[in-house]
Amino acid sequence: QPYKLDSQLIQHIDTLIRRKLSPEQVCAYLCKHHQITLHHSTIYRYLRQDKSNGSTLWQHLRICSKPYRKRYGSTWTRGKVPNRVGIENRPAIVDQKSRIGDWEADTIVGKGQKSALLTLVERVTRYTIICKLDSLKAEDTARAAVRALKAHKDRVHTITMDNGKEFYQHTKITKALKAETYFCRPYHSWEKGLNENTNGLIRQYFPKQTDFRNISDREIRRVQDELNHRPRKTLGYETPSVLFL
């Protein structure tokens, strides 16, 4: 027999789905924080019924979004990164994920390449920092990265990034944070797949062609907080914030 959802439980489910949690994450959250045992198939069934009634709650499911792919043209990434150290020289401990403090960095470019976000993701906890960039100039990216990570300086050992020109002043980051920077092999973006995946989650909130100049810092912080307070299956349904902070 299908589980009968009462109005209070439905309110909980609606709130969590609107926060972009998957049905599996909703079940884990309800079990952990409200001692409610529910199977994710029950939530999918509820969402299907809700959709047939004309509701749009189902649109908050991540399955509705196309996979994120970085698409701002290879011309921006051409050239040789000054003082580049390749990922093949990165310490083995980074891949072992046995410590907190190894980060991946990337950018999400807005409409017409006129605006962008810098995204920083810690590899073990999935803790995410999102910053609005004034431009894609290397000096702006370096300044934003230092400003974002300075408060966590004792937990910044390495930062892995791609070969985009926006990261050409990575030595400023290294000097300010006393951390090492490493670069993926050209066209091997999967070597920092965690950040690529996180950017896909961020694109749920800010679709392609978003002009980030029109997005407030408060809104960006709201998205950052939602991601960091979302229970993750890979973390045993714990949240990045709890594990990192």
Model-derived regions: residue spans:
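Acidic/histidine-rich, metal-coordinating catalytic segments
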Residues: 154-169, 187
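Short conserved beta-strand segments at catalytic cores or DNA/RNA-binding microdomains
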Residues: 95, 108, 112-129
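Mobile genetic element proteins and their domesticated derivatives, centered on retroelements
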Residues: 13, 26, 43, 106, ...
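Active-site beta-loop-alpha junctions of metal-dependent nucleic acid enzymes
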Residues: 109-113, 130-153
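DNA-recognition alpha helix
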Residues: 23-35
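Charged alpha-helix within mobile-element recombinases
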Residues: 7-19, 29-30, 150, 174-245
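Two-metal-ion RNase H-like nuclease active-site motif
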Residues: 100-110
